[in-house]
């Protein structure tokens, strides 16, 4: 089902813990969003864990909306993924490299349903660009001194 996933990776000159702490903090998500759709965290914990639910104020094509997400995968400093009503998942995987930083892979996984809709709406290509932007922003934030 890899054809229903979009993934991009980047190497960040920071330990996995620092990077993971950013990703696991919904309040930081607007700083890390390459799509320009994430506005602010409105509900949920300050730091995510398996099963956490968190709400985000969003805006797409000028229209505001609220999205509730639930963490469905969690391995401290290694993997975190969440899904929402659309059933697709956003997943981050972190791999510390020997003295070379941390490889971060972000995946938009739409194998869980509505694949035809996602493909027809252009979501895979649009989300690939957004992931690339998000990873650049994550790198910038994580590498700050």
What are these regions (language model features)?
Residues 1-46:
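Hydrophobic ligand-binding cavity/cleft-lining segments
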Residues 57-74, 80:
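Helix-adjacent hinge/juxtasegments
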Residues 79-133, 138:
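Beta-strand/loop substructures that line and gate deep hydrophobic ligand-binding cavities in soluble
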Residues 36-39, 140-145:
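Short, highly charged C-terminal tails/helix-capping segments
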């Amino acid at each position: 089902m890899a054809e229903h996933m979009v993934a991009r990776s980047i190497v960040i000159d920071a330990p996995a813990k620092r990077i993971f702490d950013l990703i696991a903090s919904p309040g930081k998500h607007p700083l890390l969003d390459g799509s320009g759709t994430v506005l602010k965290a409105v509900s949920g914990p300050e730091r995510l864990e398996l099963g956490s639910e968190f709400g985000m104020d969003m805006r797409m094509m000028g229209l505001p909306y609220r999205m509730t997400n639930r963490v469905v995968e969690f391995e401290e400093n290694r993997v975190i993924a969440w899904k929402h009503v659309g059933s697709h998942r956003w997943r981050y995987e972190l791999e510390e490299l020997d003295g070379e930083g941390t490889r971060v892979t972000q995946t938009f996984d739409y194998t869980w349903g509505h694949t035809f809709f996602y493909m027809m709406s252009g979501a895979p290509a649009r989300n690939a660009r957004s992931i690339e932007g998000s990873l650049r922003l994550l790198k910038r934030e994580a590498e700050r001194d």
